[in-house]
Structure formats: C-alpha cells, structure tokens
C-alpha cells in the first residue's frame, strides 16, 4: 500500500485505519505537552538544525522555568508532559540529577505522566529514571537500515542507541520508537522499520516527514511528501491497532493536523505554549509564538472532526492496560 498511487485505494486505507482506531479508542485523542528544554547537543546529525556544528542561537532552560512551563501545559489540558533535550553534556555528564529533580517535581505538581527524550543515556541513568517512575523513554532510531543510519547519525552507534531503549523497556518503562521519511530510505526500509517497532515492543510508534534544515548537510534535500507519512501512519494503525501513534504539529503546524488524524493517528504531539521561549524540532518556530500549537487550537479541530480530547484519567487508564 505504501507505494500505490490510486487515490481511491489510499482513501480506503485511511478509512480502515480510522475504524481500527475507533475500535480501541472510540472518539478520544490524546494530547502531549512539549518542553524542548535544551537545544545544546554533542551530536552532529546530518538532518538536524540543532546539530553541534551549526552556528545558531541556543538555549538551556532552568529547572524552575521547565517546571513552570509544564504546570501551564497541565492546566491547559494536556495528558502528558514530554521533556526533550539535545544530548546536552551539562545534563548528561555534569548534572543529570537536575533532570531527575525536574521530573519528580513535575509529576508531583501536575499528577501527569512524563516522557523523557534525552538521547542516549547510560544504563545507570535509565535505572534512575525508571526508579523515579518516569513512564516513557523516547528515542528514535530514524531508520533501521544500518548504512542509512550511519549517514544520518554521523559517528553514532546503532547498537548503543537500540540498547538504550531496550534496556529502558526491561526496566519497566514504556518506549517510543520513530522513523524519518524523505532521507534516502526505500519502501522496503520503511516496512522493515514498522516490523522492528513491533519486535522491540514499542507502545508508541511515530513517523515524521523530513524537513530540510538551514545550515545542515541535508539542507538541499526536498521536503518530504506528507502523503507518504500519512500512509505510514495508517499502516502502523492497522499493524498495531492499540498503539499510540502521533500526529505531530512539528512538521506542517496546525494546518497539517487533520490529515494525520484522518490517517489513524491518536496522539497530538508538540503542543507548545506561546511566549515561553521554546522551540520545536523540525519546524522550530512554526505556529509557536502565534499560539497555533495549543490545546485550544487542537481541540477545536478535533471537535470539528467529531472527535474529543481525552481526559487525563482516560490516558492513565490506557497506560495501565
């Protein structure tokens, strides 16, 4: 189905994906608040705007700022707080305790589950995250083609990255896996990745279309076609009907939400409060300061589609299954 171009077949694929989602989740869609709290990174990924060698303005939020933003997101109605950072050596090597303290405070103050996306961390750090009760560990392989991985994630170890998420799962954390499209992969690579996501037991699986980043070696690539992304979302839904599958606001902003939900996604990610001094990842500024990535905006679109934002209790009930 990924390579078929008949519009009628594609619409039937999306229709089946929506029915599969409805069977498990009724008309409820989950909402994730996004706090990208440090854009410093030791890595030099060829696809990333925040790669180490890119001469850009960066920020690192204080623990107090992170907690305040998380509280504001919780009050706005999100179901989870997603804490994301680059592989910032300040936190990775010097003060990982600060990350743990922030997670503990957010859980206590908001009562919401937390997802941490810190890049590759040590087994000991994963154990400490798990002991704290951190629900999710997000770490994307981007591709499961090792040769392509080496071109995307320069001088990084495929097995080390895979080990981290498997170890997190072994320690009782839920795992999110993700891939990029439009970076030189084949349809066979995509199919392999979808299968691998199931093999590693990922409870949340995502795909994102590549957006060329200024100052990166892949700046000259063409922006990936979101139709392929939506087809992959639909196939993932049919393969893993009870999985969490995001529709990210980080690719096409709020205007791209409806198409991804129509393809079978059941999570809206990258909800960012305006005027908090935060960036997105693939589209670092799109819709952020204008308030286009808020619960209010996303909820209005869902209701227009006959869907409803899930409550915090409904999300916790899902996690307990």
Q: Residues of each region from the PLM?
A:
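Catalytic cores of alpha/beta
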Residues: 122-131, 184-198, 252-263
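Glycine-enriched alpha-helix->loop->beta-strand junction motifs that scaffold or abut catalytic
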Residues: 130-137, 171-173, 199-203, 262-268
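Hydrophobic faces of well-ordered beta-strands that scaffold small-molecule active sites
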Residues: 29-33, 81-83, 114-118, 137-139, ...
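N-terminal pre-triad scaffold of radical SAM enzymes
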Residues: 14-53, 58-82, 135
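Conserved SAM/AdoMet-binding glycine-rich loop
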Residues: 78-165, 170, 183, 246
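Glycine-rich, proline-tolerant flexible connector loops at the mouths of alpha/beta enzymes
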Residues: 32-35, 82-95, 147-149, 209-221, ...
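Conserved strand-turn element in the central/C-terminal portion of the radical SAM core barrel
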Residues: 88-91, 117, 164-189, 207-223, ...
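Auxiliary Fe-S-binding modules of radical SAM enzymes
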Residues: 1-6, 67, 200-321
């Amino acid at each position: 189905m990924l390579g078929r171009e008949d519009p009628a077949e594609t619409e039937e694929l999306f229709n089946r994906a929506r029915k599969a989602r409805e069977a498990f989740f009724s008309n409820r869609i989950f909402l994730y608040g996004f706090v990208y709290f440090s854009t410093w990174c030791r890595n030099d990924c060829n696809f990333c705007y925040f790669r180490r060698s890119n001469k850009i303005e960066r920020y690192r939020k204080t623990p107090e700022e992170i907690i305040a933003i998380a509280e504001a997101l919780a009050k706005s109605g999100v179901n989870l707080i997603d804490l994301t950072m680059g592989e910032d050596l300040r936190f990775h090597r010097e003060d990982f305790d600060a990350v743990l303290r922030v997670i503990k405070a957010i859980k206590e103050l908001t009562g919401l589950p937390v997802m941490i996306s810190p890049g590759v961390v040590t087994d000991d750090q994963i154990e400490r995250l798990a002991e704290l009760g951190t629900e999710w560990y997000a770490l994307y392989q981007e591709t499961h083609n090792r040769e392509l991985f080496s071109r995307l994630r320069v001088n990084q170890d495929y097995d080390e990255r895979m080990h981290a998420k498997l170890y997190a799962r072994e320690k009782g954390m839920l795992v999110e896996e993700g891939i990029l499209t439009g970076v030189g992969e084949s349809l066979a690579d995509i199919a392999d990745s979808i299968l691998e996501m199931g093999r590693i037991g990922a409870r949340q699986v995502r795909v994102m279309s590549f957006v060329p980043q200024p100052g990166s070696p892949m700046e000259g690539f063409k922006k990936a076609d979101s139709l392929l992304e939506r087809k992959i979302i639909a196939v993932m839904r049919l393969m893993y009907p009870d999985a969490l599958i995001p529709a990210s606001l980080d690719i096409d902003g709020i205007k791209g939400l409806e198409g991804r939900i129509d393809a079978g996604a059941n999570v809206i990610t990258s909800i960012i409060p305006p005027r908090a001094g935060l960036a997105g990842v693939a589209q670092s500024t799109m819709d952020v300061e204008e308030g286009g990535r808020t619960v209010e905006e996303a909820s209005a679109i869902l209701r227009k589609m006959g869907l409803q934002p899930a409550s915090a209790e409904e999300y916790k009930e899902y996690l307990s299954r």
